Each structure stands twice: as C-alpha cells, then as structure tokens.
Amino acid sequence: MDFKQQVVTALTGVLGDSLPAEKVAQLIETPKTSDLGDYAFPTFILAKTLRKAPQQIAQDLVDQMDVAGFEKVIANGPYINFFLDKAAFSDQILKTVLTEAAKYGESDLGHGGNVPIDMSSPNIAKPISMGHLRSTVIGNSIAKILTKVGFNPIKINHLGDWGTQFGKLIVAYKKWGSEEEVKEDPITNLLKYYVKFHQEDVEHPELDDEARAWFRKLEAGDEEATQLWSWFRSESLKEFQKIYDMLGVEFDSYNGEAFYNDKMDAVVEAIESKGLLQESRGAEIVDLTAYNLNPALIKKSDGATLYMTRDLAAAMYRHDTYNFVQSLYVVGGEQREHFNQLKAVLKEMGNDWSDEIHHIPFGLITQGGKKLSTRSGRVILLEEVLNDAVKLAGAQIEAKNPDLPNREEVAKQVGIGAVIFHDLKNDRLDNFDFDLEEVVRFEGETGPYVQYTNARAQSILRKANQEVVVDDQLVVADDNAWDVLKMLSNFPAVIARASKEYEPSIVAKYALRLAKAFNKYYANSKILADDDQRNARLSLVKSVSIVLETALDLLGVQAPKEM
C-alpha cells in the first residue's frame, strides 16, 4: 500500500472535481512533528472555489471523509492532519524491506537509457590530488544512484593525455630521465622532469623550441615520440589505478583527449558547412551573442584546435556511440561558461540532443576556509590523505575494539569511507572545509557514525541468534520506532529525488537521519526482551541495516559488519 496515495484517495473522495488528484498529491505535506500527524493537507487553495474560510473547509471535509484505514483524521485550523494506522504501516513497511532486501528502493525511472558520465579526468604524468576527489566520488555515486532507478550509466575517465606538455616531457625525459626511475615511481619522477624543464627553460629558451618540435613529431605519428607518449600514459594509469582501487571506483572508458585527435577536423568542417565559423583576430570563432555568451574559440590563429573543438568532438562521439538520454559532465563550477558554450554551439549546429547535456558543477574543498592548494609548496596528494585516514580509523578501532578480527581491512573501509562520505554529505555546490580528524570521528555527522550504527544493528542480530520470521505480524508499537518506520518508508522517494537532482548529499543526509533515529530507538527499547514483540523488533533492526547498507553503497562507502 502506498500510504500517501491512501491520503490522496481519501481527499479526492470528498473533493470530487474541485481539485485533480495530481494537484492534491503535490499539495500534501509532511508535518515537522509527529504530534501533527503523518501527512497534512492545506486547504487555502480551495477557499476561492468553495467561498469559505480555510478553517471551515478543513472541518467540513473531515466530517464528510471516509477515514477507514487511518488511526484518525482531524481538522487543525486550515490543515487536515492524517494519522496513519501504525500497525498496518509497520507490518507493510517491514515486510517490504525484508522481502526486497538490497533491491528496496529500485525503480524503472530510467527505462535502461544510457547516461555517459564524464568524471575524474586527471592529467597524465601528474599526481591525483585532493582536487580530483570531488569529481571522482560525486560521479561514482551519481552512477550508482542512476543504476538504482533504472538508467545505464557509462563512467568515462576523460584523461588529460594530450597537449604541448608532452613535447616538454619528452625533452625532459631524454635529457634528465631514466627508464628505471619512471618504472620505480612514474608520477613523482615524470613530474620532477617536467618541473626541471620549466626551471631550465628560463636560462635556455631553446628548450621550448625542442619541445615544440617533439610535439609536432607526436602529432605526425613519429614512432619514438608515440612510443614515449604511450609509455608515460600507461605508467601513469597504473599509478592512478591504485587510488581508484582504494576508492572502489571503476570506469567503463578511458577515452581521453588523445582519442579525439582524428575526430576534430570533421567537427570544424561541420561547423563551417553550417556557415557558423567567423574570423576574429586571425582565430576562428562561433558567435554566441544570441545566447548571451562569449564567442566559442574553435581554432587559434596558428590553425591549432582548442579544448572546445575537442569537447565538441567528444560530445558528438558519445551521442553517436551511446545514443544517450542524458550526458553528464561532473566538472568544477569554474567551467560553467565552457559547458554553456558547448551546448550552444551544438544547438547552433542543429543538434537538439544538446538539451540533454548537463554540467554537474561542485564547490571547492577548503582548509581553514582557504582553497585547498599546497602544503609546503606541493599539492596535497589524495593517496596520502586516504592513507592518513586509514591510520586514524585504525587507531580508533584499536582503542574501541582491540580484538576485532580483520582490523586492517575494517580500518581501510572506515578511513576511506569517511573521506568519501564527508565529501558527499555536503551539498554538491557548496564549498566545504576538510579537517581529517573531524572527518574520521565515530560520533557526529560522519561516515564512521553511520557505519558504526549499522555494525551495532548487525551485532544485535548476532546476539539475538534467531532468524527473523517475515510471515509474522510485524507490528512495532513504540513511539521511537514510529520515526524509524516512517524514515524507512521514505527511502525510495529519497533515491528518486537524488537521481533527479544529481545530488548524492540527499542520500548521505538521509543515512545520517536514519542512523540517529535508530540510535534513539536502541537507547529507549529493550530490543532483545523475550516477549511476543521480539520478532517484530528484530525485523526493524534488520530493515534498518538493509537500508543503511544500501544507502552507503549508493555513496560508494563500504559497510563493515563489525567495528
């Protein structure tokens, strides 16, 4: 039974044609406190049609309404407050969660439609810093949420694997590098060579000419240049993979910038054939005045193509390859103008599918309110932060539960999960402060708090040492349980909303609220008391664990059974 629909049916039964059922459903509210009921309907909208005061309308409707199936229905000023039948509600929600288990909350909103997600996208030969965390974990969580509601996400790591920097890198490697060093520690040493190049070219500007020459060779397909480029790329990817493995993130495609080298001329020709290219100071542009945007730069004065041309090629390739229903770019907010231009140029070219391209921007990670950039003159490496988080989690587990089996594995799940959860609990567009000790705390609004709550539920089930019987009447008659039950019933709507808003924080905040409600219930209930309610109480505990584990999984966070 859909309990909100029960309210809609009761209202439409007395409203007749005054208000369509869809509008009634939109107007129904959830009261802030349970003493005002479980659902409320404001009658203001009916005052004009019925020519009565809202208070009178509320009372008249209640007097005429069929209230069977509700505990009670009352007029409260201009509102009608609905109190659900707690026994029926409890039984149905718990049976649904226990029966559907990990599938609870699934839907077919997406009808299997393809959704490419451009995410993470680090630069080859440069380290993955804390700056890459957001795009990676937001993209991964959105993919999981979209899968849950019936879409088919395609996670694309659009690598920064092309550009003039590779000419510089080849020169630097040939002058100062060695194969052994690169194999031993690819990112550190390739970055070291690149930095040395920039230090040396101050005194030796001829290095820039050499770099340009090597990049031209690379563009022309020269064997040595291509072999070195390919090697730098594969060695970097091996290092990146270590971090992706730590985060539990996988990709469906690593097609980066280089993949589109042979696809850009066709884009320029297509723009030209539509009569959209204009010359401006020797460069070629598309005028976007009609969209209130700056012109899109397609070719530089030296004939070189730009990011915009490459991104146009990528967008068109993804449409042709995946026939997408949506195409997402999980990229920082500073790129907003670029993606507006991208969509506008595609639209001007006659591609109406550009309406389904969505830039998913996000805010910055800060430390002490300042942009997270460098520590002692270098970038803050994501791998170091994750390792530090694991150590902190391990120390807390050691103090709380020194005999825990698989302590090292649990420390990884908790430490890395804490970093991911902290990122995702914040509204995507907000900047947020990062303090590792706060992030890995077991109390407060943290990932470890949610994980610990789930481990507590699992511990209760182990102590009970009995199978939950789903066929019983699962009625938990307890005020503290009521808040938990209502929250469990909201989970499918939470997932649907998160999918529509591309907003993992909706799921993370829900998990925190459910954990808090369950801990209140735990503190005030004798769950393991041997009475006729024991099976129902254990079914509630098991349902909470199922939903917490599902919510954590949607965020890309693991849920250890013991902590």
Swiss-Prot record:
Q: Does the keyword ATP-binding apply?
A: yes
Q: Name one GO molecular function term.
A: ATP binding
Could you tell me which SUPFAM superfamilies the record lists for this protein?
A: Anticodon-binding domain of a subclass of class I aminoacyl-tRNA synthetases, Arginyl-tRNA synthetase (ArgRS), N-terminal 'additional' domain, Nucleotidylyl transferase
Compartment annotation:
Cytoplasm
Q: Give GO cellular component annotations, separated by semicolons.
A: cytoplasm
Q: What is its EC number?
A: 6.1.1.19
Which CDD domains does the protein's record reference? Anticodon_Ia_Arg (cd07956), ArgRS_core (cd00671)
Enzymatic reactions: tRNA(Arg) + L-arginine + ATP = L-arginyl-tRNA(Arg) + AMP + diphosphate
One Gene Ontology term of the biological-process aspect is: arginyl-tRNA aminoacylation
Query: Record's Gene3D superfamilies?
Result: Arginyl tRNA synthetase N-terminal domain, HUPs, Isoleucyl-tRNA Synthetase, Domain 1
Give yes or no: UniProt keyword Membrane.
Answer: no
Q: Which UniProt keywords apply?
A: Aminoacyl-tRNA synthetase, ATP-binding, Cytoplasm, Ligase, Nucleotide-binding, Protein biosynthesis
- As annotated in the record, motif 'HIGH' region runs over 122-132
Output the HAMAP family linked to this UniProt entry.
Answer: Arg_tRNA_synth
Protein family (similarity comment): Belongs to the class-I aminoacyl-tRNA synthetase family.
Relate the assembly described in the record: Monomer.
- Tell me what this protein is called: Arginine--tRNA ligase
